[in-house]
Regions:
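Mobile "lid/hinge" segments at catalytic clefts and subdomain interfaces of large enzymes
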Residues: 49, 142-205
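Short, Gly/Pro- and small/polar-rich lid/capping loops
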Residues: 1-24
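Glycine/threonine-rich beta-strand-loop-alpha-helix active-site module
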Residues: 129-148
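Short beta-strand elements
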Residues: 14, 24-32, 36-42, 149-171, ...
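Glycine/serine-rich anion-binding loops at beta->alpha junctions
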Residues: 16-18, 101-119, 147-159, 204-205
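Catalytic core of soluble alpha/beta enzymes
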Residues: 201, 211, 218-391
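Metal- or metallocofactor-binding catalytic centers and their adjacent structured scaffolds
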Residues: 41-130, 134, 181, 209
Length: 391
């Protein structure tokens, strides 16, 4: 082992995410001066089984400060990691897991472990003089993922828990990023003009998407279809339409309360039927409450020729939950978020299992994200089919 790769210094500090909330930044330096820096993102819509953030719950920053997390790094974790080779990511992450001893990082915090794990990965890539997208890359092809970009927002991203969370578009045909971004620009601006004309423009949601008032999911999808058509493109053939339902956010005691209307899983399925058959929706994420895997499987069985059923809260980037979903034939794609499980190693294990079973992986940002560009590197390095981001 090269002694120059040994971790010598771990620094941590409070920084702020895109919502202005405190989060954790970590820097790791090796003996020869190689370093990695990472910031932990934060989600507004979180799954029951994802890693828990450590917050202070005091008077500072509305209880969201991270001094406890910084103290855990400085006093509990850093002494265990200093002297370890940055190239040994598995051992690095296993130390974090062993210090925590829970599936949800209840003791050290998912925000703590995420920042540390990514910082070490970046430190190792710098030590090897390779960009992160090439370090431990699964392929030498460097294929860019298809971007899935938000046009409309709702749900937890817009303070409206009784609506679908994201309405997005993605390229079906091959096109350059420049061509696609131009389409996103034109579709978004066309949709905004329609909202303003009809007094339906309320503002923007957490991730930059349009936030309408007095419009339901059907009306929003109609606007997206019209806006795509105005770009002289065919919805559902050249540009795909996707929805993140985040159904757990409007579920309670067996009832889905959507726009103040109470529905069961069967009635919710009828809504998806119309969205798929008449409004060109070809990807639906978290269509049911995250513990109702049977409804996921039924929807997947009924519509798998027409639409991808995506698990986010259902899976939480956890190997064990994905294995169960595969056995139940519940999904054809999954969302990947590093801070849901809290380490690079656990994330890679989940991606590997997905690919072994022909499950597509969609690497996703969080609504409280940061200026950290690491996500883009990993989308390429790990061969993710898509990357999901805000506007």
């Amino acid at each position: 082992m090269n002694s120059d790769s040994l971790i010598e210094v771990i620094n941590c500090r409070r920084v702020f995410d895109s919502r202005g909330n405190p989060t954790i930044e970590v820097e790791i330096f090796t003996k020869n001066g190689s370093y990695g820096r990472a910031i932990s993102p934060s989600g507004a819509s979180t799954g029951l089984n994802e890693a828990i953030e450590i917050r202070d719950n005091d008077e500072m920053f509305g209880g969201k400060d991270v001094k406890k997390g910084l103290e855990i790094i400085n006093k509990k974790i850093a002494p265990q990691l200093v002297g370890l080779s940055c190239e040994n990511q598995n051992e690095f992450d296993n130390i974090l897991k062993n210090l925590d001893k829970s599936d949800q990082k209840l003791n050290i915090g998912g925000n703590v472990s995420t920042a540390l794990s990514i910082a070490n990965y970046l430190c190792a890539s710098n030590f090897n003089k390779e960009p992160a997208y090439k370090y431990h890359c699964n392929s030498n092809k460097n294929i860019l993922p298809r971007p899935e970009i938000q046009i409309f927002g709702g749900g937890a991203h817009a303070g409206n828990s009784k609506s679908f969370q994201d309405f997005l578009i993605y390229p079906i045909n091959n096109m350059t990023y420049e061509e696609y971004f131009n389409i996103v620009f034109n579709v978004s601006n066309s949709a905004k003009k329609k909202l303003i004309k009809n007094n339906n423009f309320f503002g923007y949601c957490d991730e930059g998407g349009l936030y309408p008032n007095d419009l339901n999911h059907f009306q929003i999808c109609e606007i997206i279809n019209e806006s795509i058509t105005e770009c002289k493109l065919v919805p559902g053939k050249e540009i795909g339409i996707s929805i993140d339902v985040a159904a757990s956010n409007f579920y309670k005691d067996g009832i889905y309360t959507l726009y103040d209307k109470e529905l069961d899983a069967s009635e919710l399925t009828n809504i998806y039927d119309k969205l798929i058959k008449t409004l060109n929706v070809s990807l639906i994420e978290d269509p049911f409450q995250e513990e109702d895997i049977i409804s996921f499987a039924n929807l997947q069985s009924q519509y798998n020729q027409f639409v991808s059923i995506v698990g986010d809260d259902l899976i939480c980037t956890r190997h064990d939950l994905l294995k169960n979903a595969i056995n139940q034939k519940a999904v054809s794609a999954i969302i990947i978020k590093i801070n849901q499980c809290g380490t690079i190693t656990e994330t890679l294990e989940t991606i590997k299992l997905a690919k072994q079973n022909n499950i597509k992986t969609i690497l996703s940002a969080r609504s409280g994200d940061t200026e950290d560009s690491f996500l883009s590197h990993l989308a390429i390095a790990w061969g993710n089919e898509m990357i999901k981001v805000g506007s």
